[in-house]
């Protein structure tokens, strides 16, 4: 469950290391975002010579949460940390690599590129 002011790790090689959620998109007063939801983030920590700089406002999709995701069979998949992948204006990933596992819930038409780049799909 990601909300405003939540800090997330970045699971791609876009150049950002840590981002902070500044808005949960999809609804006028939506409070929480889960896996597969799109959020607005600001870059809090970035590596030198990366594609993004500190202070930039970007869109991102949540790929891992500590809260986890519940499956239809009753199982819950939880992760050790919260992570997101940065997107461009066309909702495509900025980075060319994805680090760490992602869940099967991202297998929609919008995020097939992220699923194909991920080393492991749970």
Swiss-Prot record:
It holds the Pfam family Ribosomal_L14. One of its GO terms (cellular component) is cytosolic large ribosomal subunit. The keyword Oxidoreductase does not apply. Keywords: Ribonucleoprotein, Ribosomal protein, RNA-binding, rRNA-binding. The keyword Acetylation does not apply. Transmembrane segments: none annotated. GO terms for molecular function: large ribosomal subunit rRNA binding; structural constituent of ribosome. GO terms for biological process: translation. Belongs to the universal ribosomal protein uL14 family. Part of the 50S ribosomal subunit. Forms a cluster with proteins L3 and L19. In the 70S ribosome, L14 and L19 interact and together make contacts with the 16S rRNA in bridges B5 and B8. Binds to 23S rRNA. Forms part of two intersubunit bridges in the 70S ribosome. This is Large ribosomal subunit protein uL14. It comes from Pseudomonas putida (strain W619).
């Amino acid at each position: 469950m990601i909300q405003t002011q939540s800090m997330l790790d970045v699971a791609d090689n876009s150049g950002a290391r840590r981002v902070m959620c500044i808005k949960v998109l999809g609804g006028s007063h939506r409070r929480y975002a889960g896996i597969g939801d799109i959020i607005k983030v600001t870059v809090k920590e970035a590596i030198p010579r990366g594609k993004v700089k500190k202070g930039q406002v970007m869109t991102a999709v949540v790929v891992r949460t500590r809260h986890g995701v519940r499956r239809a069979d009753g199982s819950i998949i939880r992760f050790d940390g919260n992570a997101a992948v940065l997107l461009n204006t066309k909702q495509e990933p900025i980075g060319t690599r994805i680090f760490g596992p992602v869940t099967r819930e991202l297998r929609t038409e919008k995020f097939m590129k992220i699923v194909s780049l991920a080393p492991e799909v749970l």
